[in-house]
Amino acid sequence: MKRLAIILVLFIGGLAAEGQQLPLFSQYLYNKFLINPGVAGSDGYTSFSLSAREQWIGYSGAPRTFSFSGQTRILKRGYRLKTNTGGGNVYRPKTDGRIGLGGYIFSDKNGLVQRTGFQASYSYHLWIESSTQLSMGLAVTGYHFKINENEISFEDPNEPWLNNELRRGVFVPDADFGIFVLNPKYSIGFSSQQLFGAAAKVGNEAYRNFSMDRHYYLFGSYSFEPTSRSEIQPSALLMMSEQMKPQADIGLTYVYGQKFWAGLSYRTSKAIIANFGFTYTNMYIGYAFDFTLQEIQRVTYGTHELTVAVRFGDSARKYRWLDRY
């Protein structure tokens, strides 16, 4: 029973270190869709993003996460009838479309636990002012949990706690919801993930059910333009779950010429995050380094995160195409 308790702690700890059961990325500012399904298609582009995160490099069994995401706006092209100054009618091109689609898959290994998951989202976009868009999104999700039993040694190879479900892997369906407000100057978003709090079977008898916690994210950013070619963007992200005390990221990013950016943020779970990146034609590359202020820093080389993304669509369409409704 003692051995059973220890391994259950390892398993559940891998699922929910400090209550965080979902992968956490430091570059969410550049792919808000990962934390809010309402973001899908909000800027009118079609984009794809690949991220890799190595946490606590040098520490055995540390989390390692990979994700691939994509999103798009379903656009319709047509013509709008307008009256010109001479009293005649003219047809002018317009771009329409209120529906966004998105999805992502991820793989996350944390100690003995291997997790894979997916999300498929649908979003709807409305105008509340001439340049302010309100988006709402709903997503279906699924998570697959599996113990890597090759890394576990038992005195009894038929250890009863490792039930057939864990040997094959456990699939947990769920859903996410998000609201997102976008303006050329600011963005605000609220989302909830794992809405249903589904239960995963993690063992036999009294240890069969482990509930997935509902997670909440509140995000906001604002853009100042001290010059015509530069922006300063303060941002904040508040994260909460039913088992995790609130955690916040507070950051500041400098953008030059819409081509280069560099930022610094502080995470209240005792970490400092530096990030920078650049764009080239329709591609952007970003890198983040997390320096933890906790004791584990003595045995690690920090956390590294790399993101590569590609975006399709007319560059002049951002914000401008939105005026064509």
Annotate each language-model stretch with its function.
Residues 20-325:
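Subset of outer-membrane beta-barrel
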Residues 13-14, 189:
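Small side chains
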Residues 15-19:
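Sec/Tat signal peptide C-region and signal peptidase I cleavage site
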Residues 4-13:
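Sec-dependent N-terminal signal peptides
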